[in-house]
UniProtKB/Swiss-Prot annotation:
InterPro entries: GCS_T (IPR006223), GCS_T_bac (IPR022903), GCST_C (IPR013977), GCV_T_N (IPR006222), GcvT/YgfZ/DmdA (IPR028896), GcvT/YgfZ_C (IPR029043), TrmE/GcvT_dom1 (IPR027266). This is Aminomethyltransferase. Its EC number is 2.1.2.10. The glycine cleavage system is composed of four proteins: P, T, L and H. GO terms for molecular function: aminomethyltransferase activity; transaminase activity. It catalyses: N(6)-[(R)-S(8)-aminomethyldihydrolipoyl]-L-lysyl-[protein] + (6S)-5,6,7,8-tetrahydrofolate = N(6)-[(R)-dihydrolipoyl]-L-lysyl-[protein] + (6R)-5,10-methylene-5,6,7,8-tetrahydrofolate + NH4(+). It comes from the Bacteria. One of its GO terms (cellular component) is glycine cleavage complex. The gene is gcvT. It is an enzyme of class 2 (transferase). NCBIfam families: gcvT, PRK00389.1. Gene3D superfamilies: Aminomethyltransferase beta-barrel domains (3.30.70.1400), Aminomethyltransferase fragment (4.10.1250.10), Probable tRNA modification gtpase trme, domain 1 (3.30.1360.120).
């Protein structure tokens, strides 16, 4: 089966990017090198093509009323022009996907529109789960992205660069805020969607636009010495920032409480949602495992599946691991037995048959200081 290609595939070829198969897409893992790309985002700005991500449109009169049962988070805690990070759960309280919902407000004829940005590997599952669990006579659900491009401009310089391109200010837009509008000088008939969101721990924007406008933006940013970045740097950046990767750190067997995402569960809202009974029980009785951060001494990298030990006892398993270019040390996430999941608890990590010392930390290893 042929791999899917982004509309910007030709830009990868021009840049001699190293390409890999990611969730059925041929995507760049790196352009100039992971470390250089990582540091570009941390200290200035970097540009990612994330067109492999899925974008689902849900339309209807008050569509939040109909989709609320799919989410443990109160969907009325955000309004038009804002986004909300949340999770979609199965009936066992496991995470089907983590995603962002954007409220585009009323578009026409009293019909409101929500955009869901979902993981590439979960798009088909998400789409079918939504269709199977909702009354489709009340709402419509479509693939919003189609042949559009989704870009992520990340780093402390990202806002200023984007403002230069659109020739207007975005200072009025809050974190997780969004707009969906026409910029006459870019494309007089095209609405461009953008949000102040990202997956790096830095200021950033995610922008959904046509191929023509995307090439315009790509070329503009490259002319401003913004580094094109691949999925390799995206992974190290998100790991430093304490952000989950679906399929590694979370899946249908892990609950929000276990994954450190309990803040997304609004039991006090008293709304019915799929998986509520299981989460009520976990809230009352506690959980057996918990996702934590690990700092590992030495240069060995703890990869997915590596055991975490306390003495002779196996107390957990690593889900994600990497060298941290910012912290200059090996870092990881791991599910640890709750009784051992204590900050500063010293442990050992079994890597390729050898034990390495480590310590349990908070999941976020990096926080921006601006």
């Amino acid at each position: 089966m042929d791999l899917l290609k982004s509309p910007l595939y030709s830009k990868y070829v021009e840049s001699n990017a190293k390409l890999v198969d990611f969730a059925g897409w041929e995507m760049p893992i790196s352009f100039s090198g992971l470390i250089k790309e990582h540091e570009s985002v941390r200290y200035s700005a970097g540009l990612f093509d994330i067109s492999h991500m899925g974008v689902i449109s849900i339309k209807g009169i008050n569509p939040k009323d109909y989709i609320q049962k799919l989410f443990p988070t109160n969907l009325y805690s955000f309004c038009e022009g804002q986004g909300l990070y949340t999770v979609m759960l199965n009936d066992k309280g496991g995470i089907i996907d983590d995603l962002i919902i954007y409220d585009l407000g009323i578009q026409k004829n009293d019909i409101s529109e929500l955009l869901l940005i979902v993981n590439a590997s979960r798009y088909e599952e998400d789409f079918q789960w939504i269709k199977n669990n909702l009354n489709m006579s009340e709402i419509s659900i479509t693939n919003f992205k189609k042949d559009k491009v989704l870009l992520a401009l990340q780093g402390k310089n990202s806002f200023g660069l984007f403002e230069e391109w659109i020739e207007s200010s975005i200072s009025h837009i809050p974190n997780f805020g969004c707009e969906y509008k026409i910029f006459e000088h870019i494309s007089p008939k095209e609405k461009i969607f953008f949000s102040k969101t990202g997956y790096t721990g830095e200021n950033g924007l995610e922008i959904l636009l046509s191929k023509k406008a995307a090439i315009n933006l790509w070329d503009f940013l490259i002319s401003k010495n913004v580094a094109p970045c691949g999925l390799g740097a995206r992974d190290t950046l998100r790991l430093e920032a304490g952000m989950h990767l679906y399929g590694q750190d979370i899946n249908e067997e892990t609950s929000p409480y276990e994954a450190g995402l309990g803040w997304l569960v609004h039991l006090e809202n008293n709304h019915e949602f799929i998986g509520r009974r299981v989460l009520e029980e976990q809230s009352r009785l506690g959980i057996q495992k918990k996702l934590v951060g690990l700092s590992i001494k030495g240069k060995a990298i703890g990869r997915k599946g590596c055991a975490v030990l306390k003495g002779d006892e196996n107390i957990g398993t690593i889900t994600s691991g990497s060298w941290s270019p910012t912290k200059h040390q090996a870092i990881a996430f791991a599910y640890i037995n709750t009784s051992h999941a204590l900050i500063n608890n010293e442990v050992e990590i079994l890597i390729r048959g050898k034990k390495f010392n480590g310590v349990i930390t908070k999941r976020a290893f990096y926080k921006k200081n601006y």
